[in-house]
């Protein structure tokens, strides 16, 4: 079996978003109050405005950290461990379901872009309020190459 050679592919914003849209396993990296990093495995997607979106709860460390310091990073992983990944750095906006229609529309868009249509959107909106959910919307500012792990390429 031949060794896997590492790859690094530069991408523009549209290519980045296409890559992320197909992947929902992510690690969100925020900053604790003392400045140290805090990592959270999450499920995420891309909304119609090109923001990475993650549903969570206001009591979670990631949400508190993002409210305090909105500069975050998201490591987007493929389904297979040895497949491609990318790091996206950006600014995070936190919306709470109880904030009203804009937040609830954001949750609908989040669900649609990850899982498709819901059988009852009014029921879904009410569930987001009842559960006290928060939505993180991250606007990409910069990103790494889309990369795969492996052995370094041999110089010719």
Q: Residue ranges of each PLM-predicted region?
A:
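Short, basic/aromatic recognition patches
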Residues: 2-27
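Generic signal for short, ordered secondary-structure residues
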Residues: 13-14, 45-46, 117
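Alpha-helix boundary recognition
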Residues: 20-21, 67-68, 129
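Short beta-strand segments
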Residues: 23-58, 66, 72-76, 85-88
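AMP-binding (ANL) adenylation modules
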Residues: 79-81
């Amino acid at each position: 079996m031949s060794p896997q050679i590492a790859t690094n592919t530069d991408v523009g914003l549209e290519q980045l978003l296409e890559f992320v849209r197909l992947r929902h396993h992510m690690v969100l990296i925020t900053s604790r109050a003392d400045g140290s990093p805090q990592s959270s495995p999450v499920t995420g997607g891309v909304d119609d405005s090109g923001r990475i979106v993650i549903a969570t709860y206001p009591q979670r460390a990631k949400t508190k950290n993002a409210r305090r310091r909105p500069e975050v990073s998201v490591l987007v992983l493929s389904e297979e461990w040895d497949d491609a990944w990318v790091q996206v750095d950006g600014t995070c906006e936190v919306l709470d379901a109880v904030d009203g229609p804009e937040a609830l529309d954001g949750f609908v868009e989040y669900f649609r872009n990850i899982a498709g249509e819901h059988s009852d959107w009014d029921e879904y909106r009410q569930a987001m309020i009842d559960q006290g959910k928060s939505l993180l919307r991250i606007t990409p500012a910069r990103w790494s190459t889309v990369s795969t792990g492996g052995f370094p390429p041999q110089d010719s």
